[in-house]
Amino acid sequence: MEHANPILLGNNSPQKFITIGEVMLRLTPPNYEKIRMASSFEASYGGSEANIALALANLGVDSTFFSVVPNNSLGKSAIRWLRCNDVHCTPMILSSKEETPSCRLGTYYLETGYGIRPSKVIYDRMHSALT
């Protein structure tokens, strides 16, 4: 994929990056609610390495993300999210229950800070497809 404004090396060749990590389902209560008070959550995807791949792709860098996700609708939706944001996902592995018995997508809960109250994150990634 060619981009209009690629980031170039010293020899004017375009940069290519691959990030390796875990894409995770992010659940956030709406309107700065605290998790303990929430009756609903907004779902999106994240994870440090996935976010870096997406940010680089948005800057016009040829970006590839490698991870293992469960072979179910959550894993496939995470891959679709990355691809819709111009991140290459060819090396992604869709894991079966035989390969990773729990076959889970890591999840984290983000309580968005408000005013002087800081944001809080709770991770639930034990036995996820990548770990």
What are the language-model segments listed below?
Residues 1-35, 40:
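Positively charged, low-complexity intrinsically disordered leader regions
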Residues 12, 36, 47, 102-104:
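A generic fold-level signal
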Residues 24, 49-50, 78:
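Short, flexible micro-motifs
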Residues 31-32, 37-41, 65, 88, ...:
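Glycine-rich, flexible loop/turn motifs
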Residues 34-54:
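Short catalytic helix/loop segments, enriched in acidic residues and glycine
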Residues 44-46, 64-69:
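A short beta-strand-loop structural module common to alpha/beta enzyme folds
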Residues 51-62, 84:
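Alpha-helix C-terminal capping segments
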Residues 66-131:
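Conserved N-terminal subdomain of the carbohydrate kinase-like
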